[in-house]
UniProtKB/Swiss-Prot annotation:
It comes from Latrodectus mactans (Black widow spider). The lineage of its organism: Eukaryota, Metazoa, Ecdysozoa, Arthropoda, Chelicerata. The H8 helix is predicted to insert into membranes and form pores by assembling into tetramers. The helix is contained within a helical bundle domain that undergoes significant conformational changes during pore formation to allow exposure of the H8 transmembrane helix and transition of the toxin from a soluble monomer to a transmembrane tetramer. Homotetramer in membranes. This is Alpha-latrotoxin-Lm1a. Processed by furin-like proteases at both the N- and C-termini. The keyword Transport does not apply. Keywords: ANK repeat, Disulfide bond, Exocytosis, Membrane, Neurotoxin, Presynaptic neurotoxin, Repeat, Secreted, Target cell membrane, Target membrane, Toxin, Transmembrane. One of its GO terms (cellular component) is other organism cell membrane.
Length: 202
């Protein structure tokens, strides 16, 4: 999911597409979910990562730090992409060194899936998902099949619901038990089934 963006003057660490834990360095849960990836911030943008706007708020961002404010991110993406967030508090940790420190870069590596678009509903917001096409609408709701959730997983999306929180990233990265039943979060499917389908789609 992604376009060509002006390269920053730094080494680009390309992170191959694949399962989330192939490119997530570590995960923390401060006030939200903070992901540390194996690439600097500008490399993340250049290589096809969605940079959460909220991560760039209140962090003392400036040009010489290599970080962008909300308008900067919007300008870089040229309004070609839709970025959805579950809340403004997600990814709100201090990220002063995100652009220069590979261990603190934050963003979502998204697969090259030009045929997929997410049609967000107010009660089913999808966090930090960058889309490059409107050819197909995938509407997440209670009756959705594992196939639909597989699309979100394939995009590295963090799924939040009104009545509960199902953090796909956390289960993929931290938990060995991928058969966790999502029904208690209002999702009529299991993560394992969705993962199987996501794998088959590749």
């Amino acid at each position: 999911i992604v376009g060509t963006i002006a390269a920053a003057a730094m080494t680009v660490t390309h992170v191959a597409s694949g399962r989330l834990n192939d490119y997530i360095l570590k995960l923390e849960e401060p006030n939200g979910i903070l992901l540390h990836f194996k690439a600097p911030l500008f490399s993340i943008i250049q290589e096809g990562y969605a940079v959460p706007k909220s991560s760039l708020v209140g962090t003392g961002t400036s040009n010489n730090e290599g970080l962008l404010d909300r308008n900067g991110v919007d300008e870089m993406l040229n309004e070609k992409y839709a970025v959805q967030y579950a809340s403004e508090t997600l990814f709100s940790k201090d990220l002063y060194n995100a652009a220069s420190n590979p261990d603190s870069a934050v963003g979502f590596k998204l697969m090259e899936s030009p045929e997929i678009n997410i049609n967000e509903r107010n009660d089913w917001p999808v966090a930090s998902t960058l889309l490059r096409s409107s050819n197909v609408n995938v509407n997440l709701k209670n009756s959705d099949t594992p196939l639909n959730l597989a699309y979100f997983i394939d995009q590295g999306a963090d799924i939040n619901t009104r009545n509960g929180h199902l953090n796909i990233v956390k289960y993929l990265v931290e938990e060995e038990d991928l058969s966790v039943d999502g029904s208690k979060y209002g999702i009529d499917m299991t993560i394992r089934t969705a993962l199987d389908i996501a794998t088959d789609l590749k």
